[in-house]
Structures are given as C-alpha cells and as structure tokens.
Swiss-Prot record:
It is found in: Nucleus; Chromosome. The keyword Nucleus applies. It comes from Octopus vulgaris (Common octopus). Its main location: nucleus. The lineage of its organism: Eukaryota, Metazoa, Spiralia, Lophotrochozoa, Mollusca. This is Sperm protamine P3. GO terms for molecular function: DNA binding. Transmembrane segments: none annotated. GO terms for cellular component: nucleosome; nucleus.
C-alpha cells in the first residue's frame, strides 16, 4: 500500500517565510 502525501507550502515563520535559526 502506498501513501501519497500532499504538501502545501503555506507555512510562514518569522517575517519573511524562511526558517530562522536560533530565534523563534
């Protein structure tokens, strides 16, 4: 059985949508 995952790029972190290191 194969499972397909759908990815939605709608996650924004910080001010620019990029993952910031160290600070949350």
């Amino acid at each position: 059985r194969r499972r397909r995952r759908r990815r939605r790029h709608r996650r924004r972190r910080g001010r620019r949508g990029r993952r910031s290191r160290g600070r949350r």
